[in-house]
Amino acid sequence: METTNGTETWYESLHAVLKALNATLHSNLLCRPGPGLGPDNQTEERRASLPGRDDNSYMYILFVMFLFAVTVGSLILGYTRSRKVDKRSDPYHVYIKNRVSMI
């Protein structure tokens, strides 16, 4: 009976992802020119009329910027709220201030 290692499936899936990424990066699809090699007006018109691969890239950039802003905003709010809690539970405010007011 053969025992399976839990990292083998993880390693295989990681290898498959890296292999696909490598194939995508080294493929000629990204650098391949259009059907015409020369400066043909029909080629330019076809290229302009076809939907591009990066048409919604600005939406992706805005989405990432929004997520970054939400993350930074939550960190700032969390920090300022924790400072307010620390000020209220400060020993000066709890013990010394009350005793000075009694004198």
Swiss-Prot record:
Location (main, coarse): membrane
GO MF: potassium channel regulator activity; transmembrane transporter binding; voltage-gated potassium channel activity
Tissue specificity remark: Expressed in hippocampal neurons (at protein level). Widely expressed with highest levels in kidney and moderate levels in small intestine.
Ranges of Basic and acidic residues composition bias in the record: 43-53
Gene Ontology BP, a term: membrane repolarization during action potential
Subcellular location: Cell membrane; Cytoplasm; Perikaryon; Cell projection, Dendrite
Pfam families for this protein: ISK_Channel (PF02060)
Outcome, altering residue 99 to H: In BRGDA6; uncertain significance; also in a patient suffering from drug-induced torsades de pointes; uncertain significance
Residue numbers on the Cytoplasmic membrane side: 78-103
GO cellular component: basolateral part of cell; cytoplasm; dendrite; membrane raft; neuronal cell body membrane; perikaryon; plasma membrane; vesicle
InterPro entries listed in its UniProt record: K_chnl_KCNE (IPR000369), K_chnl_volt-dep_bsu_KCNE3 (IPR005426)
Location of region: Interaction with KCNQ1: 68-79
Transmembrane segments: 57-77
Region annotation (Disordered) ranges: 32-53
Superkingdom to which the source organism belongs: Eukaryota
Keywords: Brugada syndrome, Cell membrane, Cell projection, Cytoplasm, Disease variant, Glycoprotein, Ion transport, Membrane, Potassium, Potassium transport, Transmembrane, Transmembrane helix, Transport
Membrane topology field: Single-pass type I membrane protein
Primary role: Ancillary protein that functions as a regulatory subunit of the voltage-gated potassium (Kv) channel complex composed of pore-forming and potassium-conducting alpha subunits and of regulatory beta subunits. KCNE3 beta subunit modulates the gating kinetics and enhances stability of the channel complex. Alters the gating of the delayed rectifier Kv channel containing KCNB1 alpha subunit. Associates with KCNC4/Kv3.4 alpha subunit to form the subthreshold Kv channel in skeletal muscle and to establish the resting membrane potential (RMP) in muscle cells.
Family recorded in the similarity comment: Belongs to the potassium channel KCNE family.
Assembly: Interacts with KCNB1. Interacts with KCNC2. Associates with KCNC4/Kv3.4. Interacts with KCNQ1; associates with a KCNQ1:KCNE3 stoichiometry of 4:4; produces a current with nearly instantaneous activation with a linear current-voltage relationship and alters membrane raft localization; affects KCNQ1 structure and gating properties.
Disease field: Brugada syndrome 6: A tachyarrhythmia characterized by right bundle branch block and ST segment elevation on an electrocardiogram (ECG). It can cause the ventricles to beat so fast that the blood is prevented from circulating efficiently in the body. When this situation occurs, the individual will faint and may die in a few minutes if the heart is not reset.
Name this polypeptide is given: Potassium voltage-gated channel subfamily E member 3
Organism: Homo sapiens (Human)
Chain's gene name: KCNE3
